[in-house]
Amino acid sequence: MIKRVHLGQGKAEEILDLPNLIEIQLNSYEKFLQLERLKTNRPLLNEGLESVFRDVFPMKSSNGEVALEYEKYYIEYNSLSFTEKECKRKGQSYEAVLKIRLNLQFLTTGEIRQKDVYMGTIPLMTDRGTFIVNGAERVIVSQIHRSPGVVFYKEKDLYYARIIPYRGSWLEFEIDSKKDYLYVKIDRKKRILVTLFLRALGLNTRERIIETFYKIRKIEVNEDTKREITGQYLATNIIIKENMTYRAGDKITLQDIEDFLQNGVKEIDLIDFDGYDSVPGKHFISSDVILNCFEKEDAYFSLKDGFKELSRESVMLAVYSVLLPGEPISIDNAESDLRNVFFSEKRYDLGHVGRYKLSKKFGLDDLTTSVLTMTDIVNTISHLLRIYDGHDVLDDIDHLGNRRVRSVGELLTNIYKGAMSRVEKIAKDRMSNKEVFNLKPQELISVKPIVSAVKEFFATSQLSQFMDQVNPLAELTHKRRLNALGPGGLSRDRAGFEVRDVHYTHYGRMCPIETPEGPNIGLIVSLATYAKVNDYGFLETPYRKVVDGKVTDEIEYLSAIDEEKKCIAQANAAVNAEGNYIDDLISVRVSGDYTTMIPKNIDYMDVSPRQLISVSSALIPFLEHNDANRALMGSNMQRQAVPLLFPQPPIVGTGMERIVAKDSGVVVKAKRSGIVVLATSKKIVIRPEDAADDHDLDEYELAKYERTNQDTSFNHSVLVKEGQVVNKGEIIADGPATRYGEVALGNNLLVGFIPWNGFNYEDAILISERIIKEDLYTSIHIKEFSIEVRETKLGPEKVTADIPNVSGKILNKLDENGIVRIGTYVKPGDILIGKVTPKSEGDITPEFKLLTSIFGEKAKDVKNNSLKVPHGTEGTVIDVQRITKDDVSNLPPGVDEILKVYIAKKRKLKEGDKMAGRHGNKGVVAKILPVEDMPYLADGTPLDICLNPLGVPSRMNIGQLMESQLGLAGKYLGEYYDVPVFESATNECIQEKLKKAGFNETSKAVLYDGYTGEPFENEVMVGIIYMLKLHHLVDDKMHARSTGPYSLVSQQPLGGKAQFGGQRLGEMEVWALEAYGAAHTLQELLTVKSDDMSGRVKIYENIVKGIPTNVSGIPESFNVLMQELRGLGFDLSIYDDKGNQIPLTEKEEELINKT
């Protein structure tokens, strides 16, 4: 194990240990399946799968005679046919059978029939947080989406309030600030006046609406108050005589006051616009928008002056025609339909998150009601009008209080909810249709919708992804990813800049650095190191509590909503041993503002400087000295580093390397403390301290050269010896890209920042041959090739070494069964599996028929259908798998067996491979120079790698220089360093280490030219830099074509390596050749090498026969042009120099021949 020296400015030990880095996956799935609770007691009723079944059951028949009740569910572990490893090898899914116990109750007789009903299979999560589906490891990525609840926002001149439920219709209110009207939209349909909507929901008079939204004051009517009353609005109706009525919401004129005085009206109720804030707990408004809506109503329904209230019929007609246009209407039905849209639990569900958000927004205590209430609607309208008047502020849609995370468990719960609603429908139909008393519970439940929904989700959902398994970091990051795309999320094209941007609430929750470059930037992000997801799905981050200016060790997790307006100090603020701040003014954050405060006003303090970034970014030393764009590239490229044969841990690390290796799941950890009894390359056996008897041993199977999803090699190497004592949780075997229990993605190289003969121009890299000879960047890549042996109409296909028309030389790599031998080195075109397929009669030539009729020979009527090594692949066969129906019961229909061949290739670093450091400093290897030609130090040590110094200043990633300097000191002092992010070693500290190692404090040295032995004119900065080899290998990209497939439509060669295609010769390339006057080159490129069908056959014939040739026919594209011109009415024909017509098509040829 490596001893690391802590060189950070802070303390070596953290206040709070990092949580398990894949707990977002494990916890969410445990919440869904509740496996631990199933073993001991009842699962929680409102969580996961249990809640799905509780929502659907009990089911009752329409006549009320039969009820189907749910008791419990359980997982049949004995139904697991294969282990995780076997599932991968045999292409199966790692899943178990789900059963539920149902009671069918006959309410008339009291009889109960109980049965455990099969509910399909359910994929199980491995302890690494992944699923194995059809033999491949997959990850369900967490989705970040708009939280249910209410949001207030503004677009152009419109103010909006939107109530978003978890399930059900969206309700949207909008104020048009130009016209001062308030409208409602249901599910983004046509808009309705808000007063009409409120009347439809039960506030059926003007008086009731005014009473709900406005403060009312009483005032005496007399000569003194005349002036005050004029122009005010009535709050209640006044009826003096039949022809003298005044409506609530009408404006009072001087004439009206005269009428009041004449008719003895002593006191009236007015709307008090100024008293909107005077009643605690009431959200009154000061806006006349609702009164304007009354006027608009009058115009809409053509109500003349005089006392008229809208009838219930006309209101319902207006609202229902928008809700369900074109439907026949009955008033009672319309009213119940409208109420069902928002107030029925069957059709509307705010979810506990939506209810929490609504109650939090309006200061209510209710956390249980799952539907909307009239109070919610009134509060929403009031709040929107208060915002419009400037008494309240708008919401920020991108605030993390308005976005929440849906992880595996919740996504699966939703899938099961959808499937179970279909199951319920079918069951209810069966209850009413069948002879009820002969029924059994299992006959009512149709399991098809569930099976297909779960299968579809795991196989095809946008959030179920093929795991990125290039290296342990890629694996870990994939499980911690947050995706804003996917079903119910954003779409790439419609997502604007604001959604993608970094928001102040991301601090400690989402990483501001790690995100893809390209169209997904900002939509796919990573969880910050300490972040957790709370019960409501909101992201939380931990803080240390500060009481009266004193920092305590009490840790509190805060969501973005809880953190609002809190005053938070940075983790590196100076604190003495008692927990008091040393400085008088402390730098703090308050809701996105950065300021200074006295210690007494501080509420919380960060737990660690690395809490705001993700795991990938936390692996970059001296991150704070890099430009953010380069840090983004650095964190993304570490995930593409190929696992090497001999990796080294970085000399300059950040302290995260061990944690990442431990939580990624690629290393082997001891389950219990004990003594190692056996340690071989394939197996470790430990006798635990608390062993019950001699047979109680812990066995660990190690993986040897297994293929990952990305064709890299997964290999364990043992770290313990027999007789060694190990502790629980200790790493006993390294995995890919780990060394001594730490992540090791690359190697430490001696670097010089110096241009060398133009070979490192434009980020190219010059490297020493020593790297190749010592296999420092050699990696193993394993490819899988498979072939199916089918049952055809003409008989079964056969795997055999007896293949027609194949020479013995080709067959000598196969064994007697026609399968390639393990250990054989194969090249493109070699046969891996010999397979013959019966030929149909149509395939047989007349000569062959004659031979068979003479000799009666039927043995040769088969055709060669063998599996061959494709172009660009070579290597050693390391394994062959045969999967037959005896191994796996569910082979695809018509398939007798599947054979898989694994070919491993050792790839050394070569020109054209991409390399990168951890600071976004990437480049392509341009030349591999002999060691003796490399520039060397005064003591004769040659450099390993030369980087261009021009790659540093404009990119502003100074971190690579500081890493190189400290690495140099570490190399010569034999030390490994921890340099934590945001509290890195200072320049003084680095210089001190360099002096101690005997170097100049700038780490600049005189370099000598390997060619001449002369020193270079200026001193050169040298150091030790950590470089990675990326998964962009030249061998995978190099490609050449001689002859290959052509497109059916255009008859031109296909493009791309996968299709074995050619290089496109575009119009600019044609211009270049025209400019050179290269007529013959141009002619063959545009005809026989492209789409001249007859010409290319002829030229091939001539080449085979050895005849010098210059064939040119008519290219297919010319024929297309001809036909297009003919379509426009031109009659075109072509003649040679003798005046004979040249046929363009076969039809023309026939016509010419006839004439």
Swiss-Prot record:
Q: What does this protein do?
A: DNA-dependent RNA polymerase catalyzes the transcription of DNA into RNA using the four ribonucleoside triphosphates as substrates.
Q: Which HAMAP family match?
A: RNApol_bact_RpoB
Matching InterPro entries: DNA-dir_RNA_pol_bsu_ext_1_sf, DNA-dir_RNA_pol_bsu_external_1, DNA-dir_RNA_pol_su2, DNA-dir_RNAP_su2_dom, DNA-dir_RNAP_su2_hyb_sf, RNA_pol_bsu_bac, RNA_pol_bsu_CS, RNA_pol_bsu_protrusion
**UniProt name for this protein:** DNA-directed RNA polymerase subunit beta
Q: Quaternary arrangement and interactors, per the entry? A: The RNAP catalytic core consists of 2 alpha, 1 beta, 1 beta' and 1 omega subunit. When a sigma factor is associated with the core the holoenzyme is formed, which can initiate transcription.
**GO annotations under biological process?**
DNA-templated transcription
| Key words of the record | DNA-directed RNA polymerase, Nucleotidyltransferase, Transcription, Transferase
What top-level class of enzyme does the UniProt entry assign? transferase
What does UniProt give as GO cellular component? DNA-directed RNA polymerase complex
- Gene this chain is encoded by: rpoB
One example of the protein's molecular function in GO is: DNA-directed RNA polymerase activity
Q: Which reaction is catalysed here?
A: RNA(n) + a ribonucleoside 5'-triphosphate = RNA(n+1) + diphosphate
Query: What species was this sequence derived from?
Result: Borrelia hermsii (strain HS1 / DAH)
